[in-house]
């Protein structure tokens, strides 16, 4: 049984997107900032809709995360 097998299909997508965001930023872990980006990338869940309704979008959050947290120091693959 995998770590995310008990998650809904949508939640599994969010985690995949979160991992992709973490790797894109050279991190070897998934932080809360990556989960937020994953939620926004998935785009169809209640959380994503609430964020969008408040004017919060993926591109802006991605830029803010990179400005606040920066990129990781190592290449992750």
Where are the predicted features?
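Histone-fold recognition with a strong bias for associated Lys/Arg-rich disordered tails
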Residues: 1-77
């Amino acid at each position: 049984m995998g770590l995310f097998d008990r998650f809904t299909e949508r939640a599994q997508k969010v985690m995949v997107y979160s991992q992709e965001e973490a790797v894109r930023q050279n991190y070897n872990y998934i932080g809360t900032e990556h989960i937020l980006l994953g939620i926004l990338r998935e785009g169809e869940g209640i959380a994503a809709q609430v964020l969008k309704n408040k004017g919060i979008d993926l591109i802006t959050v991605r830029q803010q995360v990179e400005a606040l947290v920066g990129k990781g120091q190592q290449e992750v693959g």
